[in-house]
């Protein structure tokens, strides 16, 4: 049965709806470097990957990296691997995630935005095979401390950061969800600080936060780590505020994205997500968040 599934998946030329299948595609094409040697997430991991962007390496030689033996500065080993650069480290990697030639990607985006495909709800999602709640989240070595969250720019960043996220929120007035890629600083085993940029026109998540703040109520949020490339692409794309990105992701994929209802908040997430963090944002509280080393080569410093 597994062989039959593998053959069918290989023959399907549509974009993958499972990150694991996408990683297998990258590895098959020589676009994924697997590193089994111990790598320190606090001092080595991101600087190692960043060398291919600042070290004069041609874009055609850029690769995704899969770190299978992650440790921290204290020597702690993590059971969860870390993948970096698997979505858009190069035009070739992005093209593979879209399953389209580079020259066809722009037209594919326009068509997907104009013709979204609704998601498909599933009852027993992969992302809920293991659910951790309550006291287990607050255990000294439990909760999100089990995640090998890297320090992106050692010596500058104020905390370990989740960066390749899908932060999912819902407009309390219209009910339309938004998916945005916002960084999240790990502050405790059960607490993150999320930065939703108040850009021109307003980032969707930030506008939702404003509405919940006006209502004097917390804002439900789901943070997805490790989703299908088409979903990850929409999180970073600047779409109209009233557009539900998951429908655009479905159009890019050529079929509805499987989704599942969260276990503790009224939000839908991609069913094949590797990790989903569910929670509430306290709209009555702000915290200092920067500095943070940005992807385009500068350190963001903000006054609070």
Where are these regions (language model features)?
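Extended, highly charged
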Residues: 2-304
